[in-house]
């Protein structure tokens, strides 16, 4: 059984990620790109809600001991944290009207979060310059 403190930590990470999506919606508002405003806001809402669900898991098991995290817990948090961040970070691109596959959105999200700088956009599917300012800011 997974430690509820791990879920609690992952929930806090997703809540933070959801709030970091909100400034992108301000760019969409500023440039009046309403088609991409709502996917960004929905993605932020989904991420924050899922984060709260994970965070509230600490109330399910009140009898759990208050020991420190083990190294296995730390590896689990880091691995799942990167994976969940990339999945939820892909939502603004995936929910937009650009018809980008989820795998491509996941790659773009992971590349952006890790500051790799690699991109698959600009090939045969869609050019980077055609994306909205809000999505580019994200």
Describe each region flagged by the PLM:
Residues 1-138:
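Membrane-proximal intracellular helices of multi-pass ion channels
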């Amino acid at each position: 059984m997974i430690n509820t403190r791990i879920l609690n930590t992952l929930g806090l990470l997703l809540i933070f990620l959801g709030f970091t999506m909100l400034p992108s919606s301000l760019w969409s508002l500023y440039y009046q790109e309403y088609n991409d405003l709502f996917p960004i806001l929905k993605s932020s809402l989904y991420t924050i809600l899922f984060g709260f669900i994970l965070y509230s898991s600490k109330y399910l098991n009140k009898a759990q001991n208050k020991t420190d995290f083990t190294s296995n817990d730390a590896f689990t948090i880091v691995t799942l944290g990167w994976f969940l961040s990339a999945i939820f970070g892909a939502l603004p691109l995936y929910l937009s009207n650009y018809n980008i596959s989820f795998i491509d959105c996941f790659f773009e999200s992971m590349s952006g979060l890790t500051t790799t700088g690699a991109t698959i956009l600009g090939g045969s599917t869609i050019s980077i310059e055609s994306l909205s300012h809000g999505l580019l800011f994200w």
